[in-house]
Structure formats: C-alpha cells, structure tokens
Amino acid sequence: YTPKEIADRIDGWWKGKFFLYDNRVAGAGDEDSIISVFEYAVRRFGCCVFLVDNLMPARFSDQSDKDFYRAQSRFTGRLVEFAKKNEVHVHLVAHPRKGDNDKKKLLTADDIGGAADITNRADNAFSLERMEEKDIAAYGYDAGLSILKNRSYGSTANIQLVYDARCRRYTKKGESDGVYGWER
C-alpha cells in the first residue's frame, strides 16, 4: 500500500517524463505500428528506454498459427535493429513457459516462453520472481532478480530484493533506501 500523499508526489514527479503508449487503446497492435510509434517517440520526445509488455497480444504480418514463433523471432529482430539504430534500450517482457517452473528452482534463459530467438537476439535477459508469502519471513526478501544473460560483460548473478510498497521501490536486501527524485 502506498499512502495517497506519496503516490501523488510520485505521480507528479513522473508527469512529463514518461510516455505511455497502450496499443490496446490506440488499436494499433501490429508490428509496423509499434515500431512507428517507437520511432516517433525517439524523434518527438527523446525517449531512450522502451518497454514491450508481452508479445502475445501483438499482431504480426503474414502470421499463421504455425508461423507464430517465426513471427516473434522476426519482430524481436526488428526491435534489436531499432535499438541499435537509435542507440536506445528496449525491454521485452517474456513470461516463463508453463510446466516445470512450479518446482522450487530459479528460472533460466531456457524457461523464457516464445521463440528461442527472443533470448538469442537479446543483449540481456533477466528474471524477476516474487517469493511465496510463506517464504518471505524465512528468507528476509520479497523477490529475486536473476541476470540470465549479459552480453556486455558476460557475468550473471542472483540478487535478493526487498519491496517497499510505501515508495513503490525495490532495493537490494541490506541496502538502505536512498533519496529519490520525487522526494526532492
């Protein structure tokens, strides 16, 4: 729970700094429209970080059921090209495959759902996993961030995080909160 006063301060700080494009509202979920809007956001607003939340609702050109993974691969390639051409960073949310993930193990890059090229083409891949309620007290953290792939440096890691609902922020377990932009 975030107190209203703090939520209002955070929302006020974000105003004018965050460009949100919801393709469900705009009715433009095809791959060409998404890339066009991203290019517009770079030119018009100077956006340099992009988030695509899930490929499942995207509409791909020339897609049939049997070509769905090929279409995902092609679109992921287009996102990589866009990022490199514009010197920006694109985060693509890909949910884990159903099945074996119920066993108590950390996710790996192989658990990422969709086309294998999603992981192959990415420069970085990471997972964010919430702890089960019954385990939080025992372990002392709420979530784990695992760096699954790091093309720049090659190193991977598992980081324990604690969520502070009061300020909507994850911090590394054991590190104190800092002063955030909305607090100034």
Task: Give short role names for the model-derived ranges.
Residues 1-45, 158-160:
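Cytosolic-facing regulatory segments adjacent to core modules
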Residues 2-12, 113-114, 133-134, 146-150:
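Intrinsically disordered, low-complexity boundary segments flanking structured domains
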Residues 2-3, 97, 108, 135, ...:
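Alpha-helix initiation/capping motif
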Residues 8-11, 102, 108, 151, ...:
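Homeobox/homeodomain signature
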Residues 15-16, 172, 184:
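Intrinsic disorder/low-complexity segments enriched in polar/charged and small flexible residues
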Residues 23-145, 179-183:
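P-loop NTPase motor core
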Residues 133-181:
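P-loop/Walker A phosphate-binding loop and immediately adjacent motor/lid segment at beta-alpha junctions
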